[in-house]
Amino acid sequence: MFKDYAKIHVKAGDGGNGCVAFRREKYVPYGGPSGGDGGRGGHVILRADGGLRTLVDFRYRTHYKAGRGTHGQGKNMHGRKGEDLVLRVPVGTEVRRAGDATLMADLTVDGQEYRVARGGRGGRGNARFAAANRRAPSFAEKGEPGEELWLELELKLLADVGLVGFPNAGKSTIISKVSAARPKIADYPFTTLEPHLGVVRVGEGESFVLADIPGLIEGAHRGAGLGHRFLRHVERTRVLIHVVDVSGREGRDPVADFEAINRELAAYDPRLAARPQLVAANKTDLPGARDNARRLAEAAGGRYEVFEISALTGEGLDRLIYRTYRLLETIPVEPAPAPIVPDERETDVTLFLVAREGNTYVVEGEGIERRVAMTDLDNPEAVQHLQELLVRIGVEDALRAEGIRPGDNVRIGRFEFEYSENPTG
């Protein structure tokens, strides 16, 4: 089964908790804190695999989770990093955050990887909080939650040439004759409901990849007849072979069909209208077809080269394929997109904004939200340490400037507190 779209939920591993421990050794009367840090959570990574042709593996499972980092231990022993989760996708997969059109990654090279969800940092053990005025801290940080999000995966086939045209125009017969691809072929419309790829060998060491795109209908650019699903696979091609049934069967007009498909291509993406296109006037072995082929050539008006072929008998295919290859030689291959590197910068805890929402004051800032999420709010000493940080970086002053009063609510990330005057403020 071919599947070119998937929506999945990924969750990176949470960081392990830091440890609260103290040295207890003979002849060491004041051992001091020795709690180690928790391990980082595992990342979720997408890896392009040239052996895959579809996103069908994501059809029955939508939730994926990486491993959690282990907790720190005494004697300054740090926790192990959580196991990364690597999900294999076909080459040509585009990755977006669900509901956001912004491209996160375009995996066009075999083996290319992109981290879609970062594992949470391990919490610091109490040994990291020792200071001149805090010789025996009895608190540690919790592990940071791993990133989680919904992703949309969209596969756009990587082919040099795309076969386009109305259903039953003969595209599948062509690809079966010129390559080893074996799509389903029958004498009725919409026999092909999924794209097929085939390698066309022209000579020694000379070949190109041909894609058989399922038949388009009028309104395809608006999604009619699964048009959006099919048209996306044309986007990466460098040359189009427009297959037109010139037999005139069932009362169809080859010239009208030819013009209708070109309108759909232009309406979907104007760049497709400017893409080099060869026209294959197919089924010339049938009565009256050659007259229609000549009418089609006149309608093309020198804009396109028209080749009279019969995919069934093979007549004219060699000439069409040879011309396609020579045309490809004149069109440069687009360079692979530069890899998108996830932002690894440390978030500055001093960068925050304070806003009022009714009776609640909201403090926003990735750095401070992370610190709160990693604080053990059940430990009074850890809470005091957090309060000292909020005073030191100016959060309390900013809240006062907004008019906060004792008893008002403060929200930082997922956590909400009741404000009280800091006795040291």
UniProtKB/Swiss-Prot annotation:
Molecular-function GO term, any one: magnesium ion binding
Annotated ranges, domain OBG-type G: 159-329
Binding residue positions for Mg(2+): S172, T192
Protein name per its UniProtKB record: GTPase Obg
EC number: 3.6.5.-
Positions contributing to GTP binding: 165-172, 190-194, 212-215, 282-285, 310-312
Entry keyword annotation includes Transferase: no
Obg domain boundaries: 1-158
A GO cellular component entry from the record: cytoplasm
All residue ranges annotated as the OCT domain in the record: 341-421
The organism's place on the tree of life at top rank: Bacteria
Assigned keywords, A-Z: Cytoplasm, GTP-binding, Hydrolase, Magnesium, Metal-binding, Nucleotide-binding
Alphabetical GO biological process terms: ribosome biogenesis
Gene transcribed to yield this protein: obg
